[in-house]
């Protein structure tokens, strides 16, 4: 089965560190910061004094080398500052895709979650949309299995969840294009938006570091 959509080449470092710091708990996002020039970075707090760090590395980064503590720790020190103690808990390097299967049903096989559609992590759409898939599907399966509905009911799963997946893919792709612009024009537009957002409220709504998902409306 083939996927329809885009594969993004940029690599990202993801790291969990344990630290006691006075950073605000809300998510921080940096565009072109001095500690990661021409790239992006993210920091947000999790439970038990664990902080998640996400850094764009670019398409040419060596994933094996970038996972090594000798490479990761200096990057994090440049981000947090030399006087912030931390313990490195976990690291990985990833790429991502924004795509879906042409159909979420193939005979008696039904696809949900990442097996049906894949999106970037910006906007928390991956696991959330998988739960929505299952919520749409399980009651239909139950009715078919006990003979209270025909198998044709399962076709509505595909018809309803594909538009929802397309909406997530569209918004996830837009977030990714804003965070990781691929052309000089896209970068200039992004940077102008960020500059205007400093003083103009209308521009703040245009800053896109990951539009959060919304419930799908079935028509």
List each language-model region with its residue ranges:
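Conserved mid-domain beta->alpha element of the FAD-binding
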Residues: 88-90, 94-175, 179
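Helical substrate-recognition/capping region of FAD-dependent monooxygenase/halogenase enzymes
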Residues: 60, 74, 143-219
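Short capping/connector residues at structural and topological boundaries
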Residues: 8, 17, 99-101, 106-109, ...
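Conserved FAD-binding catalytic core of PHBH/FMO-like flavoproteins
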Residues: 1-96
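Aromatic-acidic/polar surface patches that form glycan- and anion
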Residues: 8, 65, 126-127, 182, ...
């Amino acid at each position: 089965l083939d996927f329809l959509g885009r594969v993004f080449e940029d690599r990202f470092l993801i790291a969990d560190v344990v630290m006691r710091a006075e950073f605000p708990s809300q998510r921080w996002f940096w565009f072109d910061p001095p500690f990661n020039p021409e790239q992006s970075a993210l920091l947000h707090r999790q439970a038990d004094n664990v902080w998640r760090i996400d850094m764009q590395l670019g398409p040419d980064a060596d994933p094996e080398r970038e996972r090594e503590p000798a490479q990761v720790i200096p990057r994090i020190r440049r981000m947090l500052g030399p006087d912030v103690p931390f313990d490195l808990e976990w690291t990985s390097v990833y790429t991502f895709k924004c795509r879906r299967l042409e159909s979420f049903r193939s005979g008696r096989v039904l696809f949900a979650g990442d097996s049906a559609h894949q999106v970037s992590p910006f906007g928390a759409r991956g696991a959330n949309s998988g739960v929505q898939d299952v919520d749409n599907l399980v009651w239909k399966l139950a009715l078919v299995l006990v003979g209270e509905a025909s198998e044709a009911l399962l076709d509505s799963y595909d018809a309803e969840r594909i538009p929802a997946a397309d909406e997530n893919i569209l918004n996830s792709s837009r977030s990714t294009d804003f965070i990781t612009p691929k052309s000089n024009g896209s970068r200039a537009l992004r940077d102008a938006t960020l500059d205007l957002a400093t003083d103009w409220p209308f521009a703040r709504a245009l800053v896109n570091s990951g539009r959060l998902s919304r419930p799908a409306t079935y028509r």
